[in-house]
Amino acid sequence: MEEALAEFLRHLALEKNASAHTVKSYREDLVQALDFFRGHLQGRALEPALLTTRLLRSYMAWLHEQGYAKTTIGRRVSAVRSWCRFLCRQGTLAANPADGLRGPHQAKKLPHFLGEEDVARLLAAPPAETPLGVRDRAVLETLYSAGLRVSELTGLDLERVDLDSGLATVRGKGKRERLALLGPQALEALKRWLAVREGLAQGRGRAQAAVFLNKNGSRLTSRSVGRLVEKYLAQVGLDPRTSPHTLRHSFATHLLDNGADIRSVQELLGHRSLSTTQIYTHVTTHRLQESYEKAHPRA
């Protein structure tokens, strides 16, 4: 079964254009499932014919017994379903044992976001006197102005940014490309960063194609972006639950709050499905309800 798993992971990477992070998550989830299947079979060799609905349900029950969160169980069940569908298409399985297998019901969590004033405080936090402070301001402004995922920001190359038009070409999930819009303040922050970036890159002798570099002249990583956001959150006293992705949530919520069309927001976020974007309409509706309940005399 290891070869069948390896083939599925290759399929995800090469044919589905899944990111390395996605492939790694599938691998970890399915390796755990295979370990459970082997233990449950008590030493018998794991063959495709032994992948039964009963075995898969036993795996789900075990996940519940181990105390995993509903989101984790849902993700792992989804990984098994996807693998079984692939095995059926390949002819390895005659019937899909995962048909009808459903993860636990999960109440949709509303995305956490910052108010416009809090975003302004966070974006103003980096010092303007140091190259890294200038970089950090450009990072935060770009994340919020364009609604980028962190991986899209760290993967951004100089040749993909047009400062004259205020456009950047970013590569999102599934390696799909889209145009991201950069507002005036983000453009100004980027120009200030690019003016000092070259000196930092040359000083380290490791000039990069990346827009954003670390202090060693290498491409900035997602982990580094997380750390710098955490640092400035602490400085201005904002909710510690905030992450770089919160700026993307804030971008979408503020657009809708100010009258943007949901289809336009979908395109700007790079969502393949409108249903993914619609979670932000729930956020704005929730805020309206809260305001109504606080202000209306008969609420």
Language model segments and positions:
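Conserved catalytic core of the tyrosine transesterase superfamily
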Residues: 1-299
